[in-house]
Amino acid sequence: MGSYLNPGNKGFRESLNSEIYVDKTGLIERTNALLDTREKYICVSRPRRFGKSMAADMLAAYYGQDTDSEALFQNLYIETCPSFREHLNKYNVVKLNMQDFLSASHSVQDMLGRIQKYVIFDLTDAYETIRYRDETDLVQVMKDVYAATKHPFIILIDEWDCLFREYQQDQDAQKKYLDFLRMWLKDKDYVSLAYMTGILPIKKYGTHSALNMFSEYSMINPREMAKFFGFTEAEVKNLCERYDRSFEETRAWYDGYEVLTVENNTQQVCELYSPKSVVEAMKSGIFDNYWNQTETYEALKVYVQLNFDGLKDAVVKMLAGERIPINTGTFSNDMTTFQCRDDVLTLLVHLGYLGYHWPDKTVFIPNKEIAQEYINAISMMDWHEVIDSINASKKLLEALWNGEEATVADGIDHAHSEISILQYNDENSLSCTIHLAFYTKKTIPHCTFPVRTR
């Protein structure tokens, strides 16, 4: 057992020991089906705190040699699957968190050198008797180990895209990194499965991907991987029953990620919840914005204030409850190459700041928690008319409760005239006005409009 080669099952054991653990071992059934096939290259991208690292720990515990993990999977879904024992602890696992290497390095070249040096150290330490052709070449060392042992490798890479987030403007560094991954992984007999996770999909240059052997499962199109990252509605209902929490309140705060999944060759929309936030709300009983503990509004502010091609108008409409059609096909899968408004909106989907509805190709603000992040972001910008309307919505709601009809009418008219995108006689514009005017209702828990009787 090494630091990077067959690191053991401690990470997965800690997940199991946590107060709340939701069984996602169905992912193993799926990866077992892909072993040693042309589909053995998998890249899963999700927002932060959607269970990506936990899944990598689980796969390391299941596949890795030099440890016995059978007891950890007792009473979990994968134990009932025919492939469970066939692959349990049968592989050499190389597990890397790229953020660890990047943080310890002064350059991309230094980072790539560290990766090769440290993995080679574990391999040559574990297989001392093998004669190596070149102990400084990671690809050749892994070829030699595989030739001598016939034990193939499972490669698990967490935070694969961290370099693209920290070296946003350095295309040379990005290409060096992608070239390294391609050289290490593509068309290699020693690879039984290569599994990468991150926030962003694989970077595209022009119309081509540098790692075109990977099947990608993103927030835009997660398909059969959808239910393994994030909590499903059924899982959240079970937690609400266990902790005696309001399911309706949980849904209002943390639901809204409508992703396309495939079950028994049938496409369907799956509702996903932000797991970190649900866990915090279940344990504390307090429905609040837990998103800002993983991301700050500054991250959102950077992209919203770009205001590409009517981006500001789109955000206002989404705050008012509307959905905006977008084309995700032009996005370059990085954080800087924006050609139009839709590229920015697509990035916000990958970051978790927008939901994406596959059937009609629209984006929307998914829930109260994320709506508050938008308010936090634009409150620090020069969107004064939007902030004024949101602040006025509190007074408008009070007037509605008090039956002050003239005040309500004036408030709606004011919101309509203040937001420049709204056309006075347009029906959809009126709907947007009313929703934005009553924004407060959407952000106050248990807030319902009273029914007046005469």
Where do the model's predicted regions map?
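Phosphate-binding site recognition
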Residues: 1-434, 438-447
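Short acidic loop-to-beta-strand element that houses the catalytic metal-binding Asp/Glu
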Residues: 453-454
